[in-house]
Amino acid sequence: NDTEDSTHVRLEGNHGAASNAGITLIGYSGCGKSASLEILLSNYPQVIIHKSESFQRFPQIVYLVVVCPANSNFSALYISIGEEIDKALGNLEPVYEQMVKRARTVGEKANVICKLIEMFAIGCIIFDEIQLLDFSGQKESTYESLLTVVNKTKVAIMAVGTEDAYSKMFPNLRMSRRTGAFIEANAYC
């Protein structure tokens, strides 16, 4: 089912009953988490170009890898997602990064990200070095705001980081259950 506007096609599906998919990969620094991920992702195209019956082309982003900025908040993280969308699409200008930057609050940035996830039917967003994020702050600017994006869009998320990230990300059991499977990479080093 496609809904068209003047410049984009929005892919829609029946994801109302879909459960959140996700995975958390935690391990020692330098144990090969990011390298393993690179090898895995090299087997998949990052973008698939679909063609409609009228020969209109529209991209679907299979996955994004977002390296979390050091000592940053969720506003910076959402801007990084916009930047990675531009890179995946091969944009020479930071179109989607600027779109996210123009949103004033973290909540508005999250809403822009939701629209972009739906517009490009993004399958999975991988957050590497997630321990670098500042998880303190108000509810709107915490990991819970990211989970709200996940709940709205049903995009799968993968969090990759060191053991420090686990206690920051999951202050309670309810939060850890919402992100899916947990893999302790130390067992494979």
Could you describe each region identified by the protein language model?
Residues 6-8, 14-19, 58, 73-80, ...:
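Mid-core helix/loop region of P-loop NTP-binding domains shared across ATPases and GTPases
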Residues 48-69:
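Conserved catalytic segments around the Walker B and adjacent sensor/switch elements
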Residues 20-24, 63, 124:
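Residue-level preference for the first positions of well-ordered beta-strands
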